[in-house]
Structures are given as structure tokens and as C-alpha cells.
């Protein structure tokens, strides 16, 4: 390592000075010296147990639950019927628990939630991702459009039944006020309960943050991918949620209409950019870790992402400074032995190799640029710089025999590789470290942890 640093220091005189952008400290990674993690959150237990198909997740540096199950010690996802008494209307039109949050007992919900958390996550030292997937309604009145407008209508009727003497205008204002108050209490108190019971977990809501940049279907070549200003403003109003979250879980799912297109990168980039913005404003001591949800196949299909779109999703997420990416999948992945083999083939091909490429490159950059005390982040978020192994310097080798399969990365950084990293990336130091290259130990910052 010493000779690498000598070369690195010698190269400084040829490089531009640091661009002066302040980067908030990050929470230390979930696993030591693993600045970028890839999780598997798909129900593929049947592949292993029923069809005897090993997807080789660990071989390709993927963090998964025991037996590749949907929930476990690495990541647990709570759907509406898994946590408490979540009031909602499901996709089939069935009513649950009073439908709207102001028509259900919060105390009853929290008591049931406590029981559910103890049952689903029995390990008190749980250190994984705790993801609450409540998508039926949004806590902000103005965001309940389309099919979610039913929650506004129900809230108006609820207020009218309680206060028939009020004018229609006052009823609407009261309905909005009471709905948002109750929705906030349900979401906030549920989060705080989970964090109190399993304090070492990374807790947050799936699809928070969002930025509503879905207009690629109508804009075509005019699509910019940028989050509408009104949606960014609405995200600012959710500061109460960001402050009580310990992780953010935006999604970067690609529909097949975006396959290998410029619009795909625009879509993903701006969603991540908004998530990183929110992560930096949530707390004063460190930026929240961001774990982007992605799919290894295009949304609503069983067609694997192209190599270009692996870069668009996994590569972009790592380069933007996220803590990791979570691959979600449906029951289709494990529905038959053929579907399991299809996932395995993709894992042993482009998907697995690219994951090894990015996770290894992120570790190398953290080591040589940030002394393992921070993660590498693009200096300019809109650039096209990626954390990739340099093909002229590294090779990914897969070895397999009758008993095991392993991946080995061979190679070493050359001077020009170091120069590229220094020119295009900067360090986001973990708590307790500061300096341009996270070289300074800070007792003051450690005390905040």
C-alpha cells in the first residue's frame, strides 16, 4: 500500500484542487470496510429448498437472509397486513381497520405493532434493514391523488358525520387537518416504536423519498428526469419523517419502456439526487444512509436488465454515494425450477459480475482515497463518472468445483487509475473522521455517535 500512496502523492501536482463542496459526514457502513452493499429482498426460498437451485448470492457479494427468504436478519419488509392495524383500502377494494387513520385507534395499532415486531424480528440485536411498505395512502393530503383520492373523500365524509353543523368549506379544511394529523401520528409513532425495540436496525418507509418524475411516458425526448419543484417542496414539509428515520428507501425501478435509454439514467439520477438531498437535511450530525430499491428485471416483466441499465441502476446508485441497493423481486422468481434457473443464470452472468465490479471498486476507492474512513462520492453529481474496476488493470475470475464457487478479483491500481479517482470523486467521511481524505480522527465527532 505504501508505494501506491507515494505514487498518489506525486500525482497531486497534476490535479485540480478540491472543488470546495462540503459533504456531510456519513454514518459508518453496516459492515466494516463495505462502503456499498447489495441486498437481496426477493422471496426465492423455494429455489433453494424445493428446487435445489442455489442462486449463488453470497458468491457475488450479495447480502441476503437465511435461505434467501424475503425477511430475516439482513432485511425485513413489513407489508400492510404485517405490522399493526394499518387503516387502508387494498387493491381489490377491501376495507381494513377503519380505512382512514383518524378512524382507527393509534394505541391499538402500536400494541399490535409491538407484538408483530417481536414475532417477525425476535432478535433484539437486529442490525439489518427494517422497511415499512405502506403505499396505500400518503401522509400529505395534496399527494393523495388518483386512486388515493378515496382517502380524501372518506375523510371529508368522516368530518361531515361528526360535525354536520359546519359549512362545506370548514368541513373540508377540518378533514384535511385531522387526516394529516392522524397520518403523521401513525407513521411517526410506528417508526419510533420500531427504533426503540430494535435500535440497531436501519428503519424507514419504502418509497420515501419519492420525487414523482414519472412523466417519461409523455415527454419522450423532452424528458429531463428532474423532480418537480412542488414535489421537492412537499418533501421539505416531511422533515418530521426524515428526522425520525434512520435510513431512506427510494426506488429506482425501471419499466421496459426505459430500456437502455437516456431517459432511464435521467429517471434514476434525479430520484437519487433528491434522496441524497433529503438525507443531508434530516439530521445535523450525519447524512442518513440511502438504500435504493431496484429490480434485477424490468418492472412487471421477467426480462433481465441490460448491461447498460445495470450501470444506470447499480452503478449510478454507488457513484451518487448511496450506502447500498436492494434488489426486490416477486414470487415469479421462484415459481418453477425454470424460473429459478433463469435467475441463477443471470446472477452467474452479467448481474453477479457487475455487482462484484461495483462493490469491489467502491472498496478500493474508499481505501486509496478515503483511508477506509469514508466512501467515495462523485465530485460533481451530474457527471458520468462511475466506480468501476479499470478493465486494463483488473480481472474478475470465477472459480467453481463440486463443493464451492468463489469470485476472485485480480489486479492492482495504476497511477492513471488513481488520478481518475482523485479527479472525479471525493470522500464522504464516516462519523469520527474528517479532512479531505478522512485522515483526521475527531474525538468531538465520535462523541456525537
From Swiss-Prot:
Question: Which of this chain's residues carry glycans?
Answer: 67, 103, 111, 153, 357, 401
Residue ranges of coiled coil: none
Q: What is its EC number?
A: 3.2.1.35
The residues the entry assigns to the signal sequence are: 1-23
Give me the Gene Ontology terms describing cellular component.
cytoplasmic vesicle; extracellular region
Q: Where are the transmembrane segments?
A: none
Q: What is the purpose of this protein?
A: Snake venom endo-hyaluronidase that degrades hyaluronan to smaller oligosaccharide fragments. In venom, it is not toxic by itself, but increases the diffusion of other venom proteins by degrading the extracellular matrix. In addition, it displays antiedematogenic activity.
Domain EGF-like span(s) in chain numbering: 427-438
Superkingdom of this protein's organism: Eukaryota
Describe the protein's quaternary organization and the partners it interacts with.
Monomer.
Record organism: Cerastes cerastes (Horned desert viper)
Q: List the disulfide bonds.
A: 47-340, 211-227, 365-376, 370-427, 429-438
This entry's Gene Ontology molecular function terms read: hyalurononglucosaminidase activity
Q: What class of enzyme is it?
A: hydrolase
In its UniProt entry, what is this protein called?
A: Hyaluronidase-3
Give the residues annotated as active site: 135
Reaction(s) catalysed by this chain's protein: Random hydrolysis of (1->4)-linkages between N-acetyl-beta-D-glucosamine and D-glucuronate residues in hyaluronate
Q: Which family does it belong to?
A: Belongs to the glycosyl hydrolase 56 family.
Q: In which tissues is it expressed?
A: Expressed by the venom gland.
- Which keywords describe this protein according to UniProt? Disulfide bond, EGF-like domain, Glycoprotein, Glycosidase, Hydrolase, Secreted, Signal
> What subcellular locations does the record give?
Secreted
Amino acid at each position: 500500500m505504501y508505494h501506491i500512496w507515494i505514487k498518489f502523492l506525486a500525482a497531486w501536482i497534476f490535479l485540480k484542487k478540491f472543488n470546495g463542496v462540503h459533504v456531510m459526514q456519513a454514518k459508518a457502513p453496516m459492515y466494516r470496510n463495505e462502503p456499498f452493499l447489495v441486498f437481496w429482498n426477493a422471496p426465492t426460498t423455494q429455489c433453494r429448498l424445493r428446487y435445489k437451485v442455489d442462486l449463488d448470492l453470497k458468491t457475488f457479494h450479495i447480502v441476503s437472509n437465511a435461505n434467501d427468504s424475503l425477511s430475516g436478519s439482513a432485511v425485513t419488509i413489513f407489508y400492510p397486513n404485517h405490522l399493526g392495524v394499518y387503516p387502508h383500502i387494498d387493491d381489490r377494494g377491501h376495507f381494513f381497520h377503519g380505512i382512514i387513520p383518524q378512524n382507527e385507534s393509534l394505541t391499538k395499532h402500536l400494541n399490535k405493532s409491538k407484538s408483530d415486531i417481536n414475532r417477525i424480528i425476535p432478535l433484539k440485536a437486529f442490525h439489518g434493514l427494517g422497511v415499512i411498505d405502506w403505499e396505500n395512502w400518503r401522509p400529505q393530503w395534496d399527494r393523495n391523488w388518483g386512486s388515493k383520492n378515496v382517502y380524501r373523500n372518506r375523510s371529508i365524509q368522516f368530518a361531515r358525520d361528526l360535525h354536520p353543523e359546519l359549512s362545506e368549506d370548514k368541513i373540508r379544511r377540518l378533514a384535511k387537518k385531522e387526516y394529516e394529523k392522524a397520518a403523521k401520528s401513525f407513521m411517526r409513532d410506528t417508526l419510533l416504536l420500531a427504533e426503540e425495540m430494535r435500535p440497531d436496525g436501519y428503519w424507514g418507509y419504502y418509497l420515501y423519498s419519492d420525487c414523482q418524475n414519472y412523466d417519461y411516458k409523455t415527454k419522450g425526448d423532452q424528458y429531463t428526469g428532474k423532480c418537480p419543484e412542488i414535489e421537492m417542496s412537499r418533501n421539505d414539509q416531511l422533515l418530521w419523517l426524515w428526522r425520525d428515520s434512520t435510513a431512506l428507501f427510494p426506488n429506482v425501478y425501471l419499466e421496459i419502456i426505459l430500456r437502455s435509454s437516456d431517459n432511464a439514467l435521467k429517471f434514476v439520477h434525479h430520484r437519487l439526487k433528491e434522496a441524497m438531498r433529503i438525507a443531508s437535511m434530516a439530521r445535523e450530525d450525519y447524512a442518513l444512509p440511502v438504500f435504493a430499491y431496484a429490480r434485477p428485471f424490468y418492472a412487471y416483466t421477467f426480462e433481465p436488465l441490460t448491461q447498460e441499465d445495470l450501470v444506470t441502476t447499480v452503478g449510478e446508485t454507488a457513484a451518487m454515494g448511496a450506502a447500498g441497493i436492494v434488489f426486490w423481486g416477486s414470487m415469479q422468481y421462484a415459481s418453477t425450477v425454470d424460473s429459478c434457473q433463469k435467475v441463477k443464470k443471470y446472477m452467474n452472468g452479467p448481474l453477479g459480475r457487475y455487482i462484484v465490479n461495483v462493490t469491489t471498486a467502491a472498496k478500493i476507492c474508499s481505501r486509496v482515497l478515503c483511508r477506509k474512513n469514508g466512501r467515495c462520492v462523485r465530485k460533481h453529481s451530474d457527471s458520468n463518472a462511475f466506480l468501476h474496476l479499470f478493465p486494463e488493470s483488473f480481472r474478475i475470475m470465477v472459480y467453481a468445483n463440486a463443493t464451492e464457487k468463489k469470485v476472485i478479483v485480480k489486479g492492482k491500481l495504476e497511477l492513471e487509475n488513481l488520478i481518475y479517482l482523485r479527479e472525479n470523486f471525493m470522500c464522504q467521511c464516516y462519523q469520527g473522521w474528517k479532512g479531505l481524505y478522512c485522515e483526521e480522527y475527531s474525538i468531538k465527532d465520535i462523541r456525537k455517535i
